[in-house]
Amino acid sequence: MNNPDDLIVITRFLRQQHVLTLCAGSGMDMWCANCFYVFDEAKMALYLMTEKHTRHGELMQINPQVVGTIATQPRTVALIKGIQYRGEITELKDDAELIARQHYCRRFPVAKVVSAPLWQLNLLEIKMTNNTLDFGKKLYWSRLESQ
């Protein structure tokens, strides 16, 4: 069962960060990419911009199931905070794309001059390590358990 206190810490972390590692795969072909993201707390989703013709973009179109990480870069192990996630990604279209693009461009103004597609990564499962709470402390969230 999801712990509401865990979710508070997880969502705060997701709001504070802006770069994720996205890993996509199909069969034995896998690829990772770093992308800027905007967090939509109400939907527990991340919006990101990337081209369809990239290696990870092509893989996401074949298999929308993705995994990845979001992490800080602390100088000491006691300050490590990071998320491992599993999700499903879809290219946004029509009104959903326009709304997400407004949020994305507000956070990253340089994106206003880029015409790359916007994607919605619906988070399905999160495991967060937060050594600032306790060494090796793990926090969890699952979409299935929140429904």
Swiss-Prot record:
InterPro entries with a match to the protein in the record: Split_barrel_FMN-bd, UPF0306
SUPFAM superfamilies reported in the protein's UniProt record: FMN-binding split barrel
Similarity field: Belongs to the UPF0306 family.
HAMAP family: UPF0306
Record's protein name: UPF0306 protein YE0465
Biological source species: Yersinia enterocolitica serotype O:8 / biotype 1B (strain NCTC 13174 / 8081)
